[in-house]
Amino acid sequence: MAIQRTFSILKPDATERNITGAINALIEKAGLRIVAQKRIHMTRGQAETFYAVHKERPFFGELVDFMISGPVVVQVLEGENAIAKYRDVMGATDPSKAADGTIRKAHAKSIGENSVHGSDAPETAAIEIAQFFAGNEIVG
Ligand code: CMP
């Protein structure tokens, strides 16, 4: 299996509760390397662009409002099969359905305030990484 990169966000409910280190520990325990990371406060425009695929969904406004409600930590994670591996580590979008040992089972508050985002495919990972990081900010 090839080494891949995926894009991750530690969401405002995680920064608000000061649990970014606890989440990073689960990421690293799974064998993923944090090869880029920065704490930012997303603008409304950045959040709308990032979640444009969900524009027609009824929760879009709520999702954007939440993502700009406080700081987030954006990351690039690297490792074998990183995209699928991180989705396994995150657990189901709805924390009530997330498996034991996953980030969302341990930390997410609700389907909206679900602590983390991870890319769903190589194409989206490349687009999401490029939205927030220049090539020279990623150090593998
Ligand atoms: P994420 O992986 O960041 O991708 C899209 C996000 O939309 C998802 O995580 C959830 O946080 C959010 N989301 C999905 N379904 C709902 C919903 N029914 N209500 C509010 N937010 C949702």
Swiss-Prot record:
Main localization category: cytoplasm
Residue sites binding ATP per the record: 11, 59, 87, 93, 104, 114
Residues of the active site: 117
EC id: 2.7.4.6
Enzyme class, first EC level, given as a word: transferase
Catalytic activity: a 2'-deoxyribonucleoside 5'-diphosphate + ATP = a 2'-deoxyribonucleoside 5'-triphosphate + ADP; a ribonucleoside 5'-diphosphate + ATP = a ribonucleoside 5'-triphosphate + ADP
GO biological process: CTP biosynthetic process; GTP biosynthetic process; UTP biosynthetic process
Pfam families in alphabetical order: NDK
Cofactors demanded by this protein: Mg(2+)
Domain of life: Bacteria
SUPFAM superfamilies linked to this entry: Nucleoside diphosphate kinase, NDK
GO molecular function terms listed in the Swiss-Prot or TrEMBL record: ATP binding; metal ion binding; nucleoside diphosphate kinase activity
GO cellular component, one term: cytoplasm
Alphabetical keyword list: ATP-binding, Cytoplasm, Kinase, Magnesium, Metal-binding, Nucleotide metabolism, Nucleotide-binding, Phosphoprotein, Transferase
InterPro entries on file: NDK-like_dom, NDK-like_dom_sf, Nucleoside_diP_kinase, Nucleoside_diP_kinase_AS
Subcellular localization: Cytoplasm
Described function: Major role in the synthesis of nucleoside triphosphates other than ATP. The ATP gamma phosphate is transferred to the NDP beta phosphate via a ping-pong mechanism, using a phosphorylated active-site intermediate.
Subunit description: Homotetramer.
HAMAP family in the record: NDP_kinase
UniProt family annotation: Belongs to the NDK family.
Name of this chain's protein: Nucleoside diphosphate kinase
Species annotation: Rhodopseudomonas palustris (strain BisB5)
Lineage: Bacteria, Pseudomonadati, Pseudomonadota, Alphaproteobacteria, Hyphomicrobiales
